Regions:
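Active-site-proximal beta-strand/loop segments in catalytic clefts of secreted hydrolases
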Residues: 2-5, 10-14, 28, 41-46, ...
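Extracellular S/T/G-rich loop segment that most often corresponds to the catalytic His/Ser-adjacent loop
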Residues: 65, 91-164, 168
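Proline-centered loop/turn at the N-terminus of a beta-strand
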Residues: 6, 37, 67-69, 102, ...
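Substrate-binding/access-modulating region of protease and related hydrolase catalytic domains
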Residues: 12-98, 140-152
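Subtilisin-like serine protease catalytic core
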Residues: 1-21, 99-100, 110-111, 119-123, ...
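C-terminal subdomain of the subtilisin-like protease fold in secreted/lumenal serine endopeptidases
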Residues: 36-41, 100-103, 166-205
Length: 205
């Protein structure tokens, strides 16, 4: 999507189980201190110990101050996130709601939510294409993949494209542009269902 973007890979997943939240917080700080404009985190989780939640919250606030956009995909649990809280989220910081933070879920080719995705009228920001996405794979090959990870990568690509045309935009401003240029999905079952459509963003150029 954004051909000239540079990718910074920071591994925080141990290979099995869930990522260590201290490593996630340190990775966020490292990324923003080394010029990252768009940060993609692992899927949200419902288990966030209080002290570790504070580490991540402070790192996210630092990313907001440095002008980076932070994207996190939902889990595939068919859970209403307005009723069951998942982390990280934009309301977890004591200083106020994060303005640079986006929660994304996967949509199919028709822009509808995929089966089993988490949802929420106030806690989910946007849907992005995440079904049958052709991407790089192991062994210098390419193949199609589906899932929330693909959706977050799609959203990150569009955000990077906007940033490449307007480098002075902050993460908060890019978030606002993406939300306002998304295609409305009022007819679907999930409330406030919208998906990424990069064409309205491109029309700005």
């Amino acid at each position: 999507i954004a051909d000239n973007a540079k990718i910074m890979t920071l591994r925080i997943h141990p290979g099995e189980g869930e990522p260590y939240l201290k490593d996630m917080a340190l990775a966020i700080r490292y990324a923003v201190n080394h010029g990252a404009d768009v940060i993609v985190l692992p899927e949200q989780n419902s288990i966030y110990p209080k002290e570790q939640k504070q580490w991540v919250s402070e790192a996210l606030k630092e990313a907001e101050k440095k002008g980076a956009l932070v994207i996190v995909p939902v889990w595939d649990l068919s859970v209403d996130m307005d009723k069951d809280e998942f982390f990280p989220n934009r309301k977890m910081n004591k200083e106020g709601e994060l303005t640079n933070f986006m929660v994304v879920a996967s949509s199919d080719k028709n822009g509808n939510p995929v089966l089993n995705t988490n949802y929420g009228a106030t806690t989910l920001d946007i849907y992005a294409p995440g079904t049958d996405i052709y991407s790089s794979y192991m062994g210098d090959t390419y193949q199609k993949g589906s899932g929330e990870g693909m959706a977050s990568a799609t959203l990150a690509g569009v955000a990077a494209l906007v940033k490449s045309y307007f480098p002075k935009l902050t993460g908060s401003q890019i978030r606002d542009i993406l939300l306002k240029s998304a295609t409305s999905r009022k007819g679907v079952e999930v409330e406030k269902g919208i998906r990424v459509d990069d064409r309205p963003s491109q029309d700005l150029f």
